[in-house]
């Protein structure tokens, strides 16, 4: 996990992100106000998915999905995505030559699959098109809409790094063992700076590198990030990148 985080939350990415953050902050904050998802979380997903817009993929989406449609393992899924991509073209949101992305059919600056585009993409700038390739207002609002619909709890943290008491039962560090941060505090879970833990009604202790590595207390919004990409290392990277874009610490 640390090799992944070293790349995902590298000093270079943080520096680039802080520069780009100042450019898009008003748009991110508008999306945050509308959907209740923190602006820094939106910026962090943008950073993770396309390195703040510098790498959105260059493969024509229709071609990528048509090719995958002949892959026996994912053929049915790819055909569903291909039909969704054709509906996007039919709607006039994007021209075919601009519909580019990854080899797996993910598109735009925050890498939406076509079915997710149809369900969650937003025309935030009011130009009549949902443009997640070129309009940062649309990119950030669409990402916020996805997270809000996935269950993001407004006003609640994704989680934080914590210290565990020496006698903490690491067997309780399990995604299925959930309770309030207050109850975790009673078991010896402490914030890194000694302040009170944030209110997390349904939190779990997460040890991404095992009992000897850093510990995190993660809440419902961490699980929402897994709806965007179902890898705990990804969700942790988004949370840590958001924290550092806001001037906070990395892993201590």
What is the predicted function of each stretch?
Residues 86, 144-148, 239:
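Non-transmembrane alpha-helical segments in soluble domains
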Residues 124-127, 149-157, 191, 214-215, ...:
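Substrate-binding/catalytic groove segments of enzymes
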């Amino acid at each position: 996990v640390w090799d992944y985080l070293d790349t995902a939350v590298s000093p270079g990415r943080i520096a680039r992100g802080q520069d780009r953050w100042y450019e898009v902050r008003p748009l991110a904050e508008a999306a945050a106000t509308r959907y209740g998802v923190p602006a820094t979380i939106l910026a962090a997903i943008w950073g993770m998915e396309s390195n703040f817009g510098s790498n959105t993929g260059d493969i024509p989406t229709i071609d990528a999905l048509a090719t995958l449609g002949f892959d026996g393992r994912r053929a049915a899924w790819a055909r569903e995505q291909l039909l969704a991509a054709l509906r996007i073209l039919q709607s006039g949101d994007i021209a075919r030559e601009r519909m580019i992305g990854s080899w797996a059919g993910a598109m735009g600056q925050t890498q939406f699959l076509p079915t997710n585009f149809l369900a969650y993409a937003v025309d935030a700038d009011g130009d009549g098109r949902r443009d997640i390739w070129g309009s940062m207002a649309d990119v950030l609002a669409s990402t916020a809409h996805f997270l809000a619909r996935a269950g993001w709890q407004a006003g609640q943290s994704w989680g934080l790094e914590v210290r565990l008491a020496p006698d903490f039962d690491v067997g309780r560090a399990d995604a299925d063992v959930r309770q309030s941060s207050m109850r975790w505090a009673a078991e010896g879970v402490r914030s890194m700076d000694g302040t009170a833990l944030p209110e997390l009604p349904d939190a779990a202790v997460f040890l991404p590198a095992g009992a000897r590595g850093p510990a995190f207390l993660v809440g419902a919004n961490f699980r929402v990030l897994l709806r965007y990409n179902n890898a705990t290392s990804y969700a942790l990277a988004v949370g840590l990148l958001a924290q550092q874009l806001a001037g906070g610490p990395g892993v201590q």
